[in-house]
Amino acid sequence: MRFELRKRMEEGVPVLTWEGTEPDRASLRDLVNQWGYALEGDCQINLEAFGAQQFRGEVSEAAYFLVEALMQGAYRFGKKALGPGASQRLFELRDELAVLPQVTVYLIFSGEYGEKTDTDEGQGSAGSGREAGNEAKDSSEKNGRERAKEAVEHMVERARCLGRCRNYARMLGDLPANYLTADDLCLYARKLAAKKPALSLEIFREQELRRMGCGGILGVNQASGIEAALLHLRYQGAGRGPVTALVGKGVMFDSGGIHLKSMGGMEGMKYDMCGAADVLCLMEYAADTGCAGSLTAAVPLVENAVNEKSLRMGDVITMLSGRTVEVYNTDAEGRLILADALAFAAREADRLVDMATLTYSCQEALGDETTGYFCNEEELAEQVERACEAGGEPVWRLPLGERYRRQLLWSKTADLANYMPDKRAGASVAGCFLQEFVNGRPWVHFDMVGPAVLRKENGRLEKGATGRMFAAVARLLEV
């Protein structure tokens, strides 16, 4: 999929356009996703008209939004690339697994790009004041056009990078669980870090996790035949701003444990690692675009399996933070691994962002189109709202507070319980559980159970992992 800037419309090439009143950004994303989903041949878009109508004349911002949303709609999972040995070669196969159509999208941007205009032909006698004035004016206009062109080109390239990295995350989510175990994702991360000098990587496996005291990660994984892992990535930005930690839930498959899911409930549980995939690929995006801010990432990888070694109802585990947790529900495992990862990340970060397919309660409240989020600081919440509005990602802030927190304090044998007998307000109770482990840092938690996965085709995105919230978090990292 190519994007090419042109000054004039190309004859015979279909033009993508819209009708009706100016939509909000979320509706606009749906429209552009639909364009990308239907692409079968070359097309063109009048970038300046689009920017004037939708982005208050900010053509470079219009280009960014258009390109990444088109790539989101155009993605298809390349199932033909799967086969024997593919799980060991996912990094090498990723462009065959994350497929885009072989088409060219012409972005029509009619600025002269610094070429001569009629006024460049200098009038009047050499050295006259009028000629000098015209030359200064023309030079200013020329420089302005060149700067505008450079700005648009820069934003198109950033958007292409965002779209590519997001589609890699979707590809990881779409992989069958037997093609993407914790071992396989560790190997993928090693190859990624080897290709990206700006990224450093540490991988902690079970021996190190035991020494660290990561009881949440180890407890959830103890029935699995594959070792748990904690991926720790770092990116050093050129700026002096706060260090942001990204934390992504990586349950490679979730059976529910002893509290075994039904067949319907277990469907799609390979997607329970979409948060981990998003975080890993957001780190790649930051490295590729030279993000100004410094980042760290903590990505716990487990399988919530069931056998005689599984966590049991009533078991007490000791977390990385030193706090103890009674396991009341083995299918509330995501918060256990995130708690260890958040405590780990809080040691070196100034603010925390976690992404997780965490609770069905959030999906029941908000549906499949809107992501719920929790935040413990107003300034960060305002930044989240701006980033999501600009990216066209519908979100809704859900409450935290003592009325929900006290539902975690009933255990006689531990500091906290991971679940509550009263199942109401489950998303807020889960958010309060996570907040116990952020060590007072500014923190936002995205609960993406509904939007992260599309259960059936909708004419805008392919069924499967959607990459929702990726663009919004990418914008948040630039704040």
Regions found by a protein language model. Name each.
Residues 1-243, 247-250:
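Short amphipathic alpha-helical segment within the helicase RecA-like ATPase core
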